Amino acid sequence: MNTFSQVWVFSDTPSRLPELMNGAQALANQINTFVLNDADGAQAIQLGANHVWKLSGKPDERMIEDYAGVMADTIRQHGADGLVLLPNTRRGKLLAAKLGYRLKAAVSNDASTVSVQDGKATVKHMVYGGLAIGEERIATPYAVLTISSGTFDAAQPDASRTGETHTVEWLAPAVAITRTATQARQSNSVDLDKARLVVSVGRGIGSKENIALAEQLCKAIGAELACSRPVAENEKWMEHERYVGISNLMLKPELYLAVGISGQIQHMVGANASQTIFAINKDKNAPIFQYADYGIVGDAVKILPALTAALAR
């Protein structure tokens, strides 16, 4: 048996739902999707859900993962085994841990490949900081997986599809975190997963002010701006949501233009699936050139304005 009888899908990030649904179609005969509102439910049915389970009644101060109890109860009530697919977001991983405990299921994070053999899930994901691929065969009746972005292509909606809708009522867990306040974060983040062209900057750009040069190039060619982990995590020059690498974004654009990025394996795991990689780096021995289809050895601060002017013509 190379499919599960049923799969359960949930995404706290609506943009990740289409790819999870496409994976679900390949892995199971029946697709159940948990959603938070009617709009997401309608989208899930168009993407192939046979049954939609609307999570309802959570107080605003409680976290999404507090639905784990009623989600696990629902899953158990409808089968003695099954596969649970979640995005590898922070909320997704927290929910995966809670579901794994309640379902007595093995949990595997950041899956890059999922297959079914003899009714059991086989999962591949990066290990040792991206230096190798690890393979796990999950033996528990239920398997809970968080899926890396780009593992599956996005499912296409079909308005002619139909499905059944159910409601799952909130039940307060015995122990939970209560949100006492929220603070809006200033962010210009975009959905980089869908970008055709990406310009990504590393510390080799020199300063936060020099990132404006990359932004001008983005405007000239219609690209989105990304960065390496040190730019976001160490220097705080850009938002966390924009860094590319094994522990965050895994991109597959048509063009990935790496500016001042050395090309360490942890970063390249997130960019190596790009159709074309173009690198600019002053160090001719930088590892990035081992991955690049095209490269320029030189100072990005001098090269970017000239490149922008040429491409803007």
Curated annotation (Swiss-Prot):
Q: Which domain of life is it from?
A: Bacteria
Q: What does this protein do?
A: Required for anaerobic carnitine reduction. May bring reductant to CaiA.
Which annotated residues bind FAD?
255-283
Q: Please report the name of this protein according to its UniProt entry.
A: Protein FixB
Q: Whom does it interact with, and what assembly results?
A: Heterodimer of FixA and FixB.
Instruction: Supply the InterPro entries for this chain.
Output: DHS-like_NAD/FAD-binding_dom (IPR029035), ETF_a/b_N (IPR014730), ETF_a/FixB (IPR001308), ETF_asu_C (IPR014731), ETF_asu_C_CS (IPR018206), FixB (IPR023461), Rossmann-like_a/b/a_fold (IPR014729)
Q: Using the chain's own numbering, where are the disulfide bonds?
A: none
User: What PANTHER family does the record point to?
Assistant: ELECTRON TRANSFER FLAVOPROTEIN ALPHA (PTHR43153), PROTEIN FIXB-RELATED (PTHR43153:SF5)
Q: What UniProt keywords are attached to this protein's entry?
A: Electron transport, FAD, Flavoprotein, Transport
Involved pathway(s): Amine and polyamine metabolism; carnitine metabolism
The entry sums up its family as follows: Belongs to the ETF alpha-subunit/FixB family.
The molecular function terms in GO held by this entry are: electron transfer activity; flavin adenine dinucleotide binding
Q: Choose any GO biological process term that the UniProt entry carries and state it.
A: carnitine metabolic process
